[in-house]
């Protein structure tokens, strides 16, 4: 029988852990952790995602703020906003909600965020740390969420053959690097891959992060261990006459062909938010490392 990997349930467990750590940090060091989200433009979907992040932050006792900017803001002005936040000692985590308008260079924006406050893990410094296997950088939230789901439900990842579909800088590449850190054998597939099903059918685990509605079907699976669906698309439901969220995989056609599967919604999405807040806590600890480390040393005497 197929097990549904409940991302909402696991995310709530992680949020409780983060909440407890936040309380301990505040009680012991009087540190109130704060996340700032920069939203450029009036994308309705982006606003929904941002409001959800703020609501989750509030629920666990983390301060948060949304900075809304005009869609046609000059790139240099956006960079200036980031500079101010980098210098603000009350801010511990900074993210710029994607997508950005086409006139803004996203890579330049990621690089401008202080790597210690880069809780999306997209600054080149953090990406570099991830790829060399260092443990002191911030890792992209979706990649962390996927690994946590797999470790919670599947447990041992060592030696597993994982096919990652998608080579984006946001999910595909960092997730592949993190899987390698867990001693997986990783195959990366993309739009130029010939005979995708040949790769997916022989994998232990398939992870798709493409954003193409229901493009994976029963022909792509054959008794696989797990399928993690990162993709999110809106489609029109002919039965309900309403828009609904679906993933990259056709859930009903796939679910009986794998042992573990994530739903959309309710799978990877909640885990991404949980790890955004966990990363913000980690960022605060990195920023205040000297204070925390010195205090720990006192207790060793």
Curated annotation (Swiss-Prot):
One of its GO terms (biological process) is L-histidine biosynthetic process. Coiled coil: none annotated. Gene3D superfamilies: Leucine Dehydrogenase, chain A, domain 1, NAD(P)-binding Rossmann-like Domain. GO terms for cellular component: cytosol. It catalyses: (6R)-5,10-methylene-5,6,7,8-tetrahydrofolate + NADP(+) = (6R)-5,10-methenyltetrahydrofolate + NADPH; (6R)-5,10-methenyltetrahydrofolate + H2O = (6R)-10-formyltetrahydrofolate + H(+). NADP(+) binds at residues 166-168, 191, 232. GO terms for molecular function: methenyltetrahydrofolate cyclohydrolase activity; methylenetetrahydrofolate dehydrogenase (NADP+) activity. Pathway: One-carbon metabolism; tetrahydrofolate interconversion. Keywords: Amino-acid biosynthesis, Histidine biosynthesis, Hydrolase, Methionine biosynthesis, Multifunctional enzyme, NADP, One-carbon metabolism, Oxidoreductase, Purine biosynthesis. Its EC number is 1.5.1.5, 3.5.4.9. InterPro entries: Aminoacid_DH-like_N_sf, NAD(P)-bd_dom_sf, THF_DH/CycHdrlase, THF_DH/CycHdrlase_cat_dom, THF_DH/CycHdrlase_CS, THF_DH/CycHdrlase_NAD-bd_dom. PANTHER family: C-1-TETRAHYDROFOLATE SYNTHASE, CYTOPLASMIC, C-1-TETRAHYDROFOLATE SYNTHASE, CYTOPLASMIC-RELATED. Catalyzes the oxidation of 5,10-methylenetetrahydrofolate to 5,10-methenyltetrahydrofolate and then the hydrolysis of 5,10-methenyltetrahydrofolate to 10-formyltetrahydrofolate. Homodimer. Belongs to the tetrahydrofolate dehydrogenase/cyclohydrolase family. This is Bifunctional protein FolD. It comes from Orientia tsutsugamushi (strain Ikeda) (Rickettsia tsutsugamushi).
């Amino acid at each position: 029988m197929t097990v549904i990997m409940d991302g909402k349930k696991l995310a709530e467990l992680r949020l409780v852990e983060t909440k407890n750590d936040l309380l301990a940090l505040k009680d012991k060091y009087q540190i109130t952790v704060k996340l700032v989200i920069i939203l450029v433009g009036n994308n309705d979907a982006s606003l929904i995602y941002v409001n959800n992040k703020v609501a989750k932050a509030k629920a666990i006792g983390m301060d948060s703020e949304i900075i809304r900017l005009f869609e046609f803001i000059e790139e240099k002005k956006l960079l200036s906003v980031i500079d101010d936040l980098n210098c603000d000692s009350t801010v511990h985590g900074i993210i710029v909600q994607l997508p950005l308008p086409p006139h803004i260079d996203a890579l330049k924006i990621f690089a401008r965020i202080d790597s210690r406050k880069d809780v999306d893990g997209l600054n080149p410094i953090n990406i570099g740390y991830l790829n060399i296997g260092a443990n002191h950088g911030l890792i992209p939230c979706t990649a962390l969420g996927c690994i946590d789901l797999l470790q919670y439900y599947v447990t041992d990842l060592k030696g597993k053959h994982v096919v990652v579909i998608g080579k984006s800088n946001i999910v595909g590449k960092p997730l592949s690097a993190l899987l390698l850190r867990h001693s997986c054998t990783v195959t990366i597939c993309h739009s130029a891959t010939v005979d995708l099903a040949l790769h997916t059918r022989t994998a232990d685990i398939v992870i798709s992060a493409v954003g193409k509605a229901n493009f994976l079907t029963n022909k792509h699976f054959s008794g696989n261990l797990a399928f993690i669906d990162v993709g999110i698309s809106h489609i029109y439901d002919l039965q309900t006459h309403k828009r609904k969220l679906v993933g990259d995989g056709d859930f009903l056609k796939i679910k009986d062909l794998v042992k573990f599967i994530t739903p959309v919604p309710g799978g990877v999405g909640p885990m991404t938010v949980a790890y955004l807040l966990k990363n913000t806590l980690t960022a605060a600890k990195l920023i205040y490392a000297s204070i925390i480390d010195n205090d720990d040393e006192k207790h060793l005497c």
